[in-house]
C-alpha cells in the first residue's frame, strides 16, 4: 500500500522515552503476574498506561506546533522571491527542504545528508547511525516525502558526508539552511565545514540555522564570531518556549 502521509519523524528523546516507559510497564506486568495482587496491580498498570499515552500524545502535539513555528520563522528570514537555489544541510527526512520548495517557482532546493536507506549501522559511530537508520530520518524517506508532497520536481536529495566533502560549486546558493546539524559536527572539523559553507554561498546570500545556543562544547557564539570575521552581518534570534534554542541569521557581504 502506498503511503499518502509524509513521515518526518520525532525527536530521538521522544522515541527513547516511549521505549523506556514501555519496558517499565512490561516489567510491572511481569511482577504483577508473579504476585498475588493481580486486581490491584492491573488497575495500576492501566492507569500508568493511560498516563503514558496521553503524555506522549501531548508531547507530539507540542512538538508539531513548535516545529511549525520554527519553520515559519526560518521562512520569514529568507525573503524568498521564488527563483533561489536553496541548500539544506543535514536534511534528514526532508521537512525543512520540502517546505521551502513549496515557496519556489523556478528555484531549486538541494537537501544533503550522509544517511540513505543503505547506510550500514556497523560503522565508526554505531549509535549515531543506528538512531538515524532505525527511526527513518534518511534520504530514502525524504525522497518519498517529496513525492507525497508533490515537490519532487523542485527538490534534489544528495548523499554526502559534509564533514569530509562538500560537493558543490563556488558561490552556487542563495540560501543555506540547517536544523540542528552544525552542533553534531566534531569541534576539530567545524571550521572546515563553516569555510565550505562560506565558499558555496553567493554574495548577498543568507544563512539560516536553527541550533542550540549551547550544548556540551557547542556554542552558537563561536559560529557568529567566525562569520563576523568574514564580514557577514549576523543575528541570533531567541525562540519563545525554547530558551536554549535559537535561529542564527547571517548575510554575506
Task: Name what the model sees in each region.
Residues 163-176:
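A short acidic, Gly/Pro-enriched loop at the edge of an enzyme's catalytic core
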Residues 191-203:
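A short glycine-rich, Lys/Arg-flanked "PGG" loop and its adjoining helix->strand segment in the class I
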Residues 204-211:
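Conserved beta-strand signature within the Rossmann-like core of class I S-adenosyl-L-methionine
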Residues 93-105:
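Conserved SAM-binding loop of SAM-dependent methyltransferases across substrates and taxa
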Residues 104, 185-186, 201-203:
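Helix-to-beta-strand junctions that scaffold the AdoMet/dcAdoMet cofactor pocket
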Residues 6-17, 50-78:
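Class I SAM-dependent methyltransferase Rossmann-like catalytic core
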Residues 128-164:
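S-adenosyl-L-methionine
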Residues 83-92:
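Conserved class I S-adenosyl-L-methionine
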Amino acid at each position: 500500500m502506498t503511503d499518502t502521509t509524509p513521515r518526518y519523524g520525532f525527536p530521538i528523546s521522544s522515541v527513547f522515552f516511549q521505549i523506556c516507559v514501555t519496558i517499565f510497564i512490561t516489567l510491572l506486568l511481569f511482577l504483577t503476574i508473579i504476585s498475588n495482587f493481580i486486581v490491584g496491580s492491573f488497575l495500576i498498570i492501566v492507569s500508568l498506561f493511560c498516563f503514558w499515552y496521553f503524555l506522549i500524545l501531548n508531547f507530539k502535539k507540542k512538538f508539531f506546533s513548535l516545529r511549525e513555528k520554527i519553520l515559519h520563522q526560518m521562512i520569514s528570514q529568507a525573503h524568498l522571491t521564488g527563483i533561489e537555489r536553496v541548500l539544506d544541510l543535514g536534511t534528514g527526512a526532508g521537512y525543512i527542504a520540502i517546505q521551502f520548495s513549496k515557496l519556489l517557482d523556478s528555484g531549486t532546493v538541494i537537501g544533503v545528508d550522509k544517511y540513505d536507506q543503505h547506510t550500514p549501522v556497523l560503522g565508526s559511530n554505531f549509535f549515531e547511525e543506528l538512531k538515524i537508520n532505525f527511526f527513518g530520518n534518511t534520504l530514502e524517506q525524504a525522497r518519498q516525502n517529496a513525492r507525497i508532497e508533490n515537490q519532487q520536481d523542485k527538490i534534489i536529495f544528495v548523499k554526502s558526508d559534509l564533514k569530509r566533502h562538500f560537493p558543490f560549486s563556488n558561490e552556487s546558493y542563495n540560501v543555506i539552511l540547517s536544523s540542528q546539524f552544525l552542533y553534531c559536527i566534531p569541534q576539530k572539523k567545524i571550521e572546515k565545514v563553516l569555510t565550505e559553507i562560506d565558499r558555496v554561498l553567493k554574495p548577498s546570500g543568507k544563512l539560516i540555522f536553527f541550533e542550540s545556543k549551547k550544548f556540551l562544547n557547542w556554542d552558537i557564539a563561536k559560529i557568529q564570531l567566525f562569520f563576523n570575521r568574514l564580514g557577514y552581518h549576523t543575528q541570533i534570534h531567541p525562540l519563545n518556549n525554547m530558551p536554549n534554542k535559537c535561529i542564527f541569521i547571517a548575510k554575506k557581504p
